[in-house]
């Protein structure tokens, strides 16, 4: 739902009436600002010069021949799929963050290329392995369902996370297990084997687990068996074997939350189809490519190296790294300017209508593709035709009013996961390198939007950069330091990373509590060169080291001489023993004796201990007749995702100050979500070990290697 004022979109909210877990995240809220981005294409372009639509379309049609290919990211619009099919060309979809191998598993099982949906409300125990389901993993936004399931009570959701780098999901977990990315398959295999033994079915061969996580993983398996159909196992690795292990475990447990009859179509790109396209370009079998809303030359170095072998026609919102290399570039309207439709999951159909007239000389993607195919229909007529072809009984006006319609789900074949092809990879012994996405930036589609840069990462509390996350132990081994400066800013060491002979130089390093030793990660979406004045040359392109189809690789690291300045909004990372936030376990909470764990603080005075109200030096606000404003945040419900921070900036036109001013702690966000780690040093430990006050407080400032958050 989009709120408009005087013909302008100003706020986006989820449509809670729709039978879909959708919600708004930070990037959705920030997308309103992208509407006004001056770096968007103002008109069609031919050979780098402005052209009319008539000229550009004729030229584009002349380039699209029988040996052309349409290249897109995952398309969930039925109308756009129909328009693409009218072109009569081979269609390849590839995603910057690939889930291709996972989708392969379910395509082989059901005959439909899609992923299962997750019904978190039906789970009582979730075990996620590398799946940041409160961040960017999956097509559904599960934050709302998670918040509802985490209300304290006898049936409160228990959450266990196994992962390499500390994610939003890991920070919210009850139990967190540190595992390298290359160990994810082993972790899933050992859990599966335990469940399989209990069910009396065949197990799989798997490498031994590290001794420091072996008992934890066995304990997880026992909990899953005890929870039965209330269990849920999630896999975040783009691996067919890993996905089969997770899916089969859910099958054996009869998981009610793992729904393979309602499918998720938001990540159906095919790495194998894309690899075949690259081979055809090399051989000359493909001479031109129509790219649609995909910046493939940024995230695929393989495609970038072949760009001069094909004629590109690009439909994009700006002259990005791909469109700038195109013979013809056709400007695509922002989604808030365009008619559109979508079928993100089976059983639901949605429509979008313009909230503002196009600011530039652009057209909707469906209208452009339809015109290239020889059609003359307007965008609204194409969407009307698409809606009419569905199985909904709603009228067009009712569909527009509601924004969605429930439709008949596509019939899918049912069956059991075939485990015969499962091969569990041995973990890397050396240093592993992996990529991940941030809540604000994602894969970089909004890389010229300053709100996505200025939003502090929920875990690291850094803005404006990407950086390698590294454990404290690895930092010592590689000579890496991060130090506070006299003005309160943070500076740190940079490193040169080499993977398969390719080196990224002077990459900043952030020492991250909770990071698994022997594993380093780098966020995607940065290192842009043709995003616009905000996004150009910010950070480094992680895809230069790792293609989207690759989960991890062995790396070598050498510290460099260049120092990097971080834009950190939080310098104190522990509470240093202060009881700012009360935390207790669930059984204690359910005991009902709140006085034992929620004692009201008192302050010493000459009159003796006083409550905060009694010690107040000023008269209390008159809450009966005066203005009053307050807000209480349920810390069990808040995941720290940062969506509200950007939403507040959107609603209140909060200015962006830039990296240099953030380093001076002059950021102007109206909302602040601080993140605190536990420390190994506590008042009780200090008393037991006879540690003095100065040493105690110094050690309290140091987060644990595996902290609670």
Feature roles, as predicted:
Residues 201, 357-411, 660:
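N-terminal leader/propeptide and maturation segments of large enzyme subunits in energy/redox metabolism
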Residues 162-167, 315-321:
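Short, polar loop motifs at secondary-structure junctions
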Residues 389-462:
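Long, low-complexity segments enriched in small/aliphatic residues
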Residues 1-211, 462-466, 473-477, 482-709:
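N-terminal export/assembly segments and adjacent metallocofactor-ligating motifs
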Residues 175-281, 389-396:
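Active-site phosphate/pyrophosphate-binding segments
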Residues 136-156, 300-314, 348-351:
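A short, gly/pro- and small-residue-rich
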Residues 318-352, 668, 673:
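Flexible glycine/proline-rich, aromatic-decorated loop/lid segments
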Residues 69-71, 126-130, 160, 232-234, ...:
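Structural motif
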């Amino acid at each position: 739902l989009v709120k408009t004022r005087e013909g302008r979109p100003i706020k986006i909210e989820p449509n809670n009436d729709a039978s879909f877990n959708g919600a708004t995240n930070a990037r959705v809220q920030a997308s309103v600002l992208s509407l006004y981005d001056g770096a968007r294409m103002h008109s069609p372009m031919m050979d780098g010069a402005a052209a009319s639509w008539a000229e550009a379309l004729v030229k584009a049609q002349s380039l699209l021949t029988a040996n052309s290919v349409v290249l897109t990211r995952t398309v969930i619009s039925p109308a756009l799929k129909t328009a693409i099919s009218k072109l009569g060309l081979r269609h390849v979809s590839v995603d910057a963050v690939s889930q291709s191998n996972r989708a392969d598993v379910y395509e082989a099982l059901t005959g439909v290329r899609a992923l299962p949906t997750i019904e978190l409300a039906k789970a009582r125990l979730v075990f996620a392995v590398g799946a940041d389901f409160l961040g960017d993993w999956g097509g559904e936004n599960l934050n709302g369902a998670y918040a509802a399931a985490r209300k304290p009570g006898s049936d409160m959701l228990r959450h266990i996370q196994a992962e390499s780098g500390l994610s939003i999901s890991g920070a919210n977990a009850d139990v967190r297990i540190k595992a390298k990315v290359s160990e994810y398959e082993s972790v899933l295999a050992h859990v599966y084997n335990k469940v399989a033994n209990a069910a009396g079915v065949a197990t799989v061969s798997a490498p031994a687990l590290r001794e420091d996580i072996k008992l934890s993983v066995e304990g997880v398996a026992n909990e899953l068996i005890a929870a039965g159909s209330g269990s849920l196992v999630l896999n975040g690795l783009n691996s067919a074997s890993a996905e089969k292990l997770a899916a089969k475990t859910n099958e054996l447990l009869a998981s009610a939350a793992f729904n393979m009859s309602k499918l998720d179509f938001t990540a159906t790109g095919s790495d194998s189809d894309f690899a075949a396209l690259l081979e055809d370009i090399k051989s000359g079998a493909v001479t031109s490519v129509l790219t649609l809303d995909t910046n493939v030359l940024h995230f695929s170095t393989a495609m970038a190296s072949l760009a001069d072998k094909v004629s590109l026609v690009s439909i994009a919102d700006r002259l990005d790294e791909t469109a700038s290399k195109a013979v013809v570039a056709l400007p695509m309207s922002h989604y808030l300017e365009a008619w559109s439709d979508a079928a993100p999951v089976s059983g639901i159909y949605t429509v979008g209508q313009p909230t503002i007239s196009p600011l530039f000389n652009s057209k909707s993607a469906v209208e452009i593709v339809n015109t290239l195919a020889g059609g003359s229909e307007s965008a609204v007529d194409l969407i009307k035709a698409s809606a009419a072809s569905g199985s909904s009984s709603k009228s067009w006006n009712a569909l527009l009013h509601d924004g969605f319609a429930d439709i008949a789900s596509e019939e899918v074949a049912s069956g059991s996961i075939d485990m015969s092809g499962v091969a569990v990879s041995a973990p890397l012994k050396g240093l592993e390198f992996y990529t991940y996405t941030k809540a604000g930036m994602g894969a970089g589609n909004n890389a010229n939007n300053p709100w996505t840069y200025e939003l502090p990462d929920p875990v690291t509390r850094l803005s404006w950069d990407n950086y390698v996350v590294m454990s404290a132990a690895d930092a010592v081994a590689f000579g890496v330091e991060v130090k506070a400066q006299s003005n309160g800013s943070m500076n740190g060491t940079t490193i040169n990373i080499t993977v398969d002979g390719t080196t990224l130089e002077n990459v900043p390093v952030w020492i991250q509590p909770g990071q698994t030793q022997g594993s380093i990660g780098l966020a995607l979406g940065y290192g842009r060169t043709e995003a616009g004045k905000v996004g150009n040359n910010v950070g480094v392109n992680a895809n230069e080291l790792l293609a989207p189809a690759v989960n991890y690789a062995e790396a070598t690291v050498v510290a460099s001489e260049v120092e990097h300045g971080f834009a950190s909004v939080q310098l104190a990372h522990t509470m240093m023993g202060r009881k700012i936030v009360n935390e207790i376990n669930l059984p204690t909470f359910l005991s009902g004796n709140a006085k034992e764990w929620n004692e009201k603080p008192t302050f010493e005075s000459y009159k003796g201990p006083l409550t905060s109200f009694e010690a107040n030096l000023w008269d209390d606000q008159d809450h009966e007749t005066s203005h009053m404003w307050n807000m209480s945040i349920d810390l069990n419900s808040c995941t720290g995702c940062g969506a509200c921070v950007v939403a507040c900036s959107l609603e209140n036109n909060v200015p962006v100050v830039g990296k240099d001013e953030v380093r001076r702690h002059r950021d102007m966000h109206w909302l602040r979500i601080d993140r605190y780690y536990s420390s190994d040093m506590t008042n009780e430990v200090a008393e037991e070990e006879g540690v003095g006050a100065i040493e105690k407080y110094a050690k309290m400032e140091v987060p644990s290697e595996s902290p609670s958050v």
